[in-house]
């Protein structure tokens, strides 16, 4: 009986996806789109210019950035593309 109850709990957790994760884009600059699942509740896109031109970094969370770097944070799946 305990095994059946444990199985039902596990199936419920899997079906309800209680450990919801965000899907954020993580490709750099003009690379083809790639995504990753994140535990954070936000995605970011950092943009800056250097000797190679405009650079873009995407990922999970909402990091602090240095002066001169544009940061955009958002809260929906793949919102940082």
UniProtKB/Swiss-Prot annotation:
<keyword id="KW-0008">Acetylcholine receptor inhibiting toxin</keyword>
<comment type="function">
    <text>Binds to muscle nicotinic acetylcholine receptor (nAChR) and inhibit acetylcholine from binding to the receptor, thereby impairing neuromuscular transmission.</text>
</comment>
<dbReference type="GO" id="GO:0090729">
    <property type="term" value="F:toxin activity"/>
</dbReference>
<dbReference type="GO" id="GO:0030550">
    <property type="term" value="F:acetylcholine receptor inhibitor activity"/>
</dbReference>
<dbReference type="GO" id="GO:0099106">
    <property type="term" value="F:ion channel regulator activity"/>
</dbReference>
<dbReference type="InterPro" id="IPR045860">
    <property type="entry name" value="Snake_toxin-like_sf"/>
</dbReference>
<keyword id="KW-0800">Toxin</keyword>
<dbReference type="Pfam" id="PF21947">
    <property type="entry name" value="Toxin_cobra-type"/>
</dbReference>
<dbReference type="InterPro" id="IPR003571">
    <property type="entry name" value="Snake_3FTx"/>
</dbReference>
<feature type="disulfide bond">
    <location>
        <begin position="74"/>
        <end position="79"/>
    </location>
</feature>
<protein>
    <recommendedName>
        <fullName>Short neurotoxin 2</fullName>
    </recommendedName>
</protein>
<keyword id="KW-0732">Signal</keyword>
<keyword id="KW-0964">Secreted</keyword>
<feature type="disulfide bond">
    <location>
        <begin position="62"/>
        <end position="73"/>
    </location>
</feature>
<keyword id="KW-0629">Postsynaptic neurotoxin</keyword>
<feature type="signal peptide">
    <location>
        <begin position="1"/>
        <end position="21"/>
    </location>
</feature>
<comment type="similarity">
    <text>Belongs to the three-finger toxin family. Short-chain subfamily. Type I alpha-neurotoxin sub-subfamily.</text>
</comment>
<keyword id="KW-1015">Disulfide bond</keyword>
<feature type="disulfide bond">
    <location>
        <begin position="38"/>
        <end position="60"/>
    </location>
</feature>
<dbReference type="InterPro" id="IPR054131">
    <property type="entry name" value="Toxin_cobra-type"/>
</dbReference>
<keyword id="KW-0872">Ion channel impairing toxin</keyword>
<keyword id="KW-0528">Neurotoxin</keyword>
<dbReference type="InterPro" id="IPR018354">
    <property type="entry name" value="Snake_toxin_con_site"/>
</dbReference>
<feature type="disulfide bond">
    <location>
        <begin position="24"/>
        <end position="43"/>
    </location>
</feature>
<dbReference type="GO" id="GO:0005576">
    <property type="term" value="C:extracellular region"/>
</dbReference>
């Amino acid at each position: 009986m305990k095994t059946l109850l444990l199985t039902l709990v596990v199936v419920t957790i899997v079906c309800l996806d209680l450990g919801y994760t965000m899907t954020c884009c993580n490709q750099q600059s003009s690379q083809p789109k790639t995504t990753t699942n994140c535990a954070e509740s936000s995605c970011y896109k950092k943009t800056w210019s250097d000797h190679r031109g405009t650079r873009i970094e995407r990922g999970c969370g909402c990091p602090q950035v240095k002066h001169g770097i544009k940061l955009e944070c958002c809260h929906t799946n793949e919102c940082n593309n």
